[in-house]
Swiss-Prot record:
Residues that, per the record, bind Zn(2+) 2: H130
Span list, region Disordered: 168-196
Glycosylation (residues): S185
Cited PANTHER family: ALPHA-CRYSTALLIN A CHAIN, HEAT SHOCK PROTEIN HSP-12.2-RELATED
Any GO BP: microtubule-based process
PROSITE patterns listed in its UniProt record: SHSP
Name of the molecule in the record: Alpha-crystallin A chain
Native species: Mesocricetus auratus
Length: 196
């Protein structure tokens, strides 16, 4: 059985010209006449034509506009203080703030590989309000060349904000590049991540 993979904005981008099948599984959109009988309309009568208005409605434009409206009206859209990731590189310190509120320190792995820090989080399937869910993410950030890799630290605040930080050294000193794991410590107080 072949599976059609498409971007969700353009599920019906070509309207009636798109070779749609009932098994494409566009749940929640309703069925259109060409979903049930794609070739029947032209085989019954050669004079049958679908209305232009119906073609425009089915073409995906209305879906695109609806999707854009929902994206623009989400509370986090365009609001930098609700951004879950923040990377800051000051003169004397490099800091990464990452929102990982669905993970415990045991679910997180932080490693330094040469000039990169890799943060991986995974928890097995567990029950939440809507059913069962499992989550996994993998982030990779390039460390500035002057970060002292022997003094890197990582902590998880009570509100689920992971803070990875490391001091910078003067340009004449060697920062040291090796692979090592960074333990994640738990803090009892909420994060003091900047809101801008």
């Amino acid at each position: 059985m072949d599976v059609t993979i498409q971007h969700p904005w353009f599920k019906r981008a070509l309207g009636p010209f798109y070779p749609s099948r009932l098994f494409d599984q566009f749940f929640g959109e309703g069925l259109f006449e060409y979903d049930l009988l794609p070739f029947l309309s032209s085989t019954i009568s050669p004079y049958y034509r679908q209305s232009l208005f119906r073609t425009v409605l089915d073409s995906g434009i209305s879906e695109l506009m609806t999707h854009m409206w929902f994206v623009m009206h989400q509370p986090h859209a365009g609001n930098p203080k609700n951004n879950p990731i923040k990377v800051r590189s000051d003169r004397d310190k490099f800091v990464i703030f990452l929102d990982v509120k669905h993970f415990s320190p045991e679910d997180l792995t932080v490693k330094v590989l040469e000039d990169f820090v890799e943060i991986h989080g995974k928890h097995n399937e567990r029950q939440d309000d809507h059913g069962y869910i499992s989550r996994e993410f993998h982030r990779r950030y390039r460390l500035p060349s002057n970060v002292d890799q022997s003094a890197l630290s990582c902590s998880l605040s009570a509100d689920g904000m992971l803070t990875f930080s490391g001091p910078k050294v003067q340009s004449g000193l060697d920062a040291g590049h090796s692979e090592r794991a960074i333990p994640v410590s738990r803090e009892e107080k909420p994060s003091s991540a900047p809101s801008s």
